[in-house]
From Swiss-Prot:
TM stretches of this protein: none
Disulfide bonds: none
Biological-process GO terms, alphabetical: base-excision repair, AP site formation via deaminated base removal
Record gene name: ung
UniProt name for this protein: Uracil-DNA glycosylase
Cellular component terms per the entry's GO annotation: cytoplasm
EC number(s) from the headed UniProt entry: 3.2.2.27
Annotated function: Excises uracil residues from the DNA which can arise as a result of misincorporation of dUMP residues by DNA polymerase or due to deamination of cytosine.
Homology family: Belongs to the uracil-DNA glycosylase (UDG) superfamily. UNG family.
Principal localisation: cytoplasm
Subcellular location: Cytoplasm
Keyword DNA repair: yes
Active site: 64 (proton acceptor)
Source taxonomy: Bacteria, Bacillati, Bacillota, Clostridia, Peptostreptococcales
Catalyzed reactions: Hydrolyzes single-stranded DNA or mismatched double-stranded DNA and polynucleotides, releasing free uracil
Length: 227
């Protein structure tokens, strides 16, 4: 698994010697050796690599990575360029268009958001091909809970965007009154019409950031995938 080269490194290194993480590491070594697992090993920590701790303005929590070939690359909801945009992400883009009027991109590659300070974090960071939730309970939840707890402790305010029940279970970890929580149903086609559409998470995030003197996020994504 890749080593981080930013201010997440000392935070993450505290986890490396814990019993749960050593077991997780052994489990993953065997899984990657004997099964097809996503994302590529070098992409597991992309969310942390692309959005340093001190630069986080907002957190979008996902569940586990996409389990189809070529989709997952370490950012929640995002897919690699050239891969068909999944249904939940299509709905995210529809809401972005309705909220801020931005054109819907032809791709689902969200690196630009990550570079804008949006931590695109799944609560489980790996998955077997074709088997959603196959790495649930292997130890990732403890790891990502620690990430959320450390963000919660940070003095500079941020927004936690919690879509759906699984993400909203993490609300208990967010106790710092400096931070702001935005909740709605999940953007999945099964629930988007129950309150995700029309929830305006992008403008609400920027309204909060502006109110506390933090530069707004540019949510506009380049339309073409020639990145």
């Amino acid at each position: 698994m890749s080593v981080l080269h930013n201010d997440w490194a000392p935070i993450v290194e505290e986890e490396y010697e814990k019993t749960y993480y050593l077991k997780l590491k052994q489990f993953l070594m065997e899984e990657y050796r004997t099964k097809t697992v996503y994302p590529d090993e070098g992409d597991i920590f992309n969310a942390l690599q692309l959005t340093p701790f001190g630069k986080v303005k907002a957190v979008i929590l996902g569940q586990d990575p996409y389990h189809g070939p070529g989709q997952a690359h370490g950012l929640s909801f995002s897919v690699k360029p050239g891969v068909k945009t999944p249904p939940s992400l299509k709905n995210i883009f529809k809401e972005l268009n309705g909220d801020l009027g931005y054109d819907i991109p032809e791709h689902g590659y969200l690196n630009q958001w990550a570079q804008e300070g949006v931590l695109m974090l799944n609560t489980v960071l790996t998955v077997r091909r074709g088997e959603p939730n196959s790495h649930k309970g292997a130890g990732w939840e403890q790891f990502t809970d620690q990430i959320i707890k450390r963000l919660n402790e940070r003095e500079t305010a941020m927004v936690f965007i919690l879509w759906g029940k699984n993400a909203q279970e993490k609300e208990a970890l967010i106790t710092n009154p400096q931070h702001h929580i935005i909740k709605s149903p999940h953007p999945s086609p099964f629930s988007a019409h129950r309150g995700f559409f029309g929830s305006h998470p992008f403008s609400k995030t920027n309204d909060f950031l502006r109110g506390v003197g933090i530069e707004e996020i540019n949510w506009n994504i380049e339309k073409s995938s020639d990145l």
